[in-house]
Amino acid sequence: MDIIGGQHLRQMWDDLADVYGHKTALICESSGGVVNRYSYLELNQEINRTANLFYTLGIRKGDKVALHLDNCPEFIFCWFGLAKIGAIMVPINARLLREESAWILQNSQACLLVTSAQFYPMYQQIQQEDATQLRHICLTDVALPADDGVSSFTQLKNQQPATLCYAPPLSTDDTAEILFTSGTTSRPKGVVITHYNLRFAGYYSAWQCALRDDDVYLTVMPAFHIDCQCTAAMAAFSAGATFVLVEKYSARAFWGQVQKYRATITECIPMMIRTLMVQPPSANDRQHRLREVMFYLNLSEQEKDAFCERFGVRLLTSYGMTETIVGIIGDRPGDKRRWPSIGRAGFCYEAEIRDDHNRPLPAGEIGEICIKGVPGKTIFKEYFLNPKATAKVLEADGWLHTGDTGYCDEEGFFYFVDRRCNMIKRGGENVSCVELENIIATHPKIQDIVVVGIKDSIRDEAIKAFVVVNEGETLSEEEFFRFCEQNMAKFKVPSYLEIRKDLPRNCSGKIIRKNLK
């Protein structure tokens, strides 16, 4: 089923500007409180100016341009400006350091970088020490270093006309983006995303949360992440709604921002929910217009109920990953919800549970969650220059192996168990890290928790828990292990405990387990 009809991203923005004109399209709030607003007409003009800027710097169709930026208007300008001229965006996680950033530059073949002054010294070092194709850097800040090969993005953009000067032929099959996975367990892989992928994501995610043009979708998720791009931004723009992009998440500021912009939709990850819950209760906790809170794994039922009761919201579950582009399993609009189910397969997708021999399993049996879509349309096209890795997860007929374990009930509701790589083998038993984390998270003194397996010469693996306790609290080993023994089977009780001030996380809030093993 083709719901795009040949409409690539350049056509999308020209149409949006014509249809919605002076309606507010984008609001960006910086960490310093600076707010920038753009109508659909103004945003399309900024996108055109940015496209013209790239053209004057020699960027042509098929060229790759890296973005190393925090949430800001320039990210949106570059994303769609590149798409308008057929070039390819390569967003880089703004938290990455020199080695990881250099690796992505090398493997993406990016020839130009847009970044800010705070990251410039790192890229100056990369240019001097690493073999990349990078030939020019644009800085979004006003002040510039006196170096060759560095330009002011804003000054160059503002010199450009508001109409597009270079419009090569485009197809919805053209690559729009190479988005490198978070790499929590290994080197990141470049997920190839087409114009069709992004257009479909917009329509699909708008359907998922029943978006209308009078909605306001607020997100604090990083713009270089698939959730911000495909679940939030593309959904809001495709529906003609208003998209609010906050530079960085603050638990203290979040509800004030929701109220200030009269947001009707937002998205949360477990880390956000837990930090919001430890804020002092306020009479304004329920003073908002939120209709849905898009939610991504994983949360205990006790935490979910407490959050919904305190803030007067409901969670709309959505399950996906970079390779699926959108939440391909989730709560459907108007459908019943069945916690802790992650929902049912969305339109244009099939989902089933398979065993280790790639055979479908009946309802109730645990296996790998597999998704069927159309590569380059409803799921990613491939891993960039990595056919071996592509073949490992993507079958020729469109079945994608997620690497997640779960099961399905008789009514088609799916249940997430854990990442396969997060299952601990302990004396012949399979133990789910997520299951243990959900139990331990209910301890009133614990703010954050992760469980990992460590080598054990006798029982294959031992279980180690890393916890962060609430501010002002203390937790003894005796108290911790007693709680575990009272709430889980004996073979699941952790053998080791380490109390930390924080846990290592990537840009989407996922804990980087490899840093703890």
Curated annotation (Swiss-Prot):
| Protein name, UniProt field | Crotonobetaine/carnitine--CoA ligase
Role description: Catalyzes the transfer of CoA to carnitine, generating the initial carnitinyl-CoA needed for the CaiB reaction cycle. Also has activity toward crotonobetaine and gamma-butyrobetaine.
Q: What would be one Pfam family of this protein?
A: AMP-binding
Alphabetical UniProt keywords: Ligase
Gene Ontology terms: biological process: carnitine metabolic process; fatty acid metabolic process
Q: Which family does it belong to?
A: Belongs to the ATP-dependent AMP-binding enzyme family.
Pathway where it operates: Amine and polyamine metabolism; carnitine metabolism
At the top level, the lineage of the source is Bacteria
Q: Does the keyword Ligase apply?
A: yes
GO MF annotation: an example: crotonobetaine-CoA ligase activity
* Enzyme class name: ligase
User: Where does the signal peptide begin and end?
Assistant: none
